[in-house]
């Protein structure tokens, strides 16, 4: 796998089923195991998703919003986020000094970046400067915005 790959699913699909289907779609048949692990407390009930395909570690990320679930898999750390295109949040919680972009778009970019870093929302979004990061906007269903980061 040379680059990241993104796949959309119905949000009623479980995370494990979506990640397994995505891995098999990209990597072919094989034994797939997945779960979550919280780096802060060690719980497997929440935290960053993980996936193994035939005993090979694959970097994964997923996000749900409304009726949509998006997964990303890659050979290196990856983050993906999808949100409704209108969010109700204070700009100072999302925007770094000098940033003026649409809040929902900025939120998805920054959450994808924080997922790729492995910190998630434990890092304040206002500390992330988009100009210093690697991300791309993804095509999303009408009424939604999505982003991918590495």
Task: List each model region and its residues.
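Core catalytic alpha/beta fold that binds nucleotide/phospho-ligands
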Residues: 1-150
